[in-house]
Amino acid sequence: MLRRRGFCCCSGAPAAAAAALLLLAVAAAAPRAAGFHLGGDESVLVRGMLAAIRREQAEAEDAARFAVAEYNKNQGAELEFARIVKAKRQVVTGTLHDLMLEVVDSGKKSLYSAKVWVKPWLDFKAVVEFRHVGDSQSQSATAADDNAGQDTADPTVASRNDLHNTENNKVSVVLSTFSQTYSV
């Protein structure tokens, strides 16, 4: 019987079986570990992504509340933050939050556009822009969310879309501490 040195057809079988069992054990434990979450309303989201989404939502809401508070302080107004209608963020030296806010002023809902620049490592926040866009009815704001990208006859939504397109095409924000212009 000839036998090659270092090779035997049966010597690797126990090791392969052990490796397969280990792989099955790891795969069975993965849904309960910090990997995937396979139940409830977050069924297909990776937990790390879900945490990142929640963190970004919290950062946007914090920036929105800061913008309203700064406006109230500087203008002597009494606006109340209601909700974020739309949020975008741009990473510059820090984060520039481009927000469409619904606020309540004396019981009347209005839309405001706000841009807030945040550098958390310096404990820095600045409102770059905060301006009234138009009046808001609950139905109009909800319709805008539901009909994103669709034509609509609602003048509030149409004017907001026109404003957004104008901003994207023509407006650039020059931040005084930068030597460059960042398009928003």
From Swiss-Prot:
Q: What is one Pfam family matched by this protein?
A: SQAPI
Q: Where is this site: Reactive site?
A: G39
Q: Where is this region: Disordered?
A: 138-165
The record's CDD domains line, in alphabetical order, gives:
CY
By what name is this protein known? Cysteine proteinase inhibitor 3
Q: What does the record give under GO molecular function?
A: cysteine-type endopeptidase inhibitor activity
Q: Which organism is it from?
A: Oryza sativa subsp. japonica
The record's family statement is: Belongs to the cystatin family. Phytocystatin subfamily.
Decide whether keyword Signal is in the record.
Answer: yes
Name the UniProt key words of this record, in alphabetical order.
Plant defense, Protease inhibitor, Secreted, Signal, Thiol protease inhibitor
The reply to whether Signal figures as a keyword in the UniProt entry is: yes
A biological process term (GO) from this entry: defense response
Which stretch carries the motif Secondary area of contact? 90-94
GO CC annotation: extracellular region
What does this gene product do?
Answer: Specific inhibitor of cysteine proteinases. Probably involved in the regulation of endogenous processes and in defense against pests and pathogens.
